[in-house]
């Protein structure tokens, strides 16, 4: 038997956690995610957004949303751009581990849509220009995974 997640958002409720840090990028990621969700028939009233100060706070907010039992998937959006110190490496690693852990412990699809880039230019490219919109891609993954888990 094959299981496959359909790309129809009808009847899905989606939570989104967005970092305010680098909001000139994360705002574009959020717009891309919401656009894809609505285009795939997720009702706008069934999309909830939680804003957090920075990427490091994303896993905790994602966990709280997941634990409510209200959502079929949670999308995490943020942008970490390398600076002159090792702070970037710690933040990227901890956010990725934290988001993965939330998904593993709750059994809910928690989609990693956090950009980890070397430069501002790379972030801009991934937020709706040359390299597409990673927020939109995260929304597609959320719809597919939510439906896949419903079919298993």
Swiss-Prot record:
GO terms for biological process: riboflavin biosynthetic process. 5-amino-6-(D-ribitylamino)uracil binds at residues 21, 55-57, 79-81, 112. Keywords: Riboflavin biosynthesis, Transferase. Coiled coil: none annotated. One of its GO terms (molecular function) is 6,7-dimethyl-8-ribityllumazine synthase activity. It is an enzyme of class 2 (transferase). One of its GO terms (cellular component) is riboflavin synthase complex. The keyword Transferase applies. Pathway: Cofactor biosynthesis; riboflavin biosynthesis; riboflavin from 2-hydroxy-3-oxobutyl phosphate and 5-amino-6-(D-ribitylamino)uracil: step 1/2. The active site is at 87 (proton donor). It holds the Pfam family DMRL_synthase. Belongs to the DMRL synthase family. This is 6,7-dimethyl-8-ribityllumazine synthase. It comes from Staphylococcus carnosus (strain TM300).
């Amino acid at each position: 038997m094959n299981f496959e997640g359909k790309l129809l958002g009808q009847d899905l409720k989606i939570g989104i956690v967005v970092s305010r840090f680098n909001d000139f990028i994360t705002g574009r990621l959020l717009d891309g995610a919401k656009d894809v969700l609505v285009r795939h028939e997720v009702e706008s009233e069934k999309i909830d957004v939680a804003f957090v100060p920075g990427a490091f706070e994303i896993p905790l907010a994602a966990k709280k949303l997941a634990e409510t039992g209200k959502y079929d998937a949670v999308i995490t959006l943020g942008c970490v751009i390398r600076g002159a110190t090792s702070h970037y490496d710690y933040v990227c690693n901890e956010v990725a581990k934290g988001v993965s852990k939330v998904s593993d412990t709750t059994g809910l699809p928690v989609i990693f849509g956090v950009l980890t880039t070397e430069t501002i230019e790379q972030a801009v490219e991934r937020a709706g220009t040359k390299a597409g919109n990673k927020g939109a891609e995260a929304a597609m993954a959320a719809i597919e995974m939510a439906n896949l888990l419903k079919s298993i």
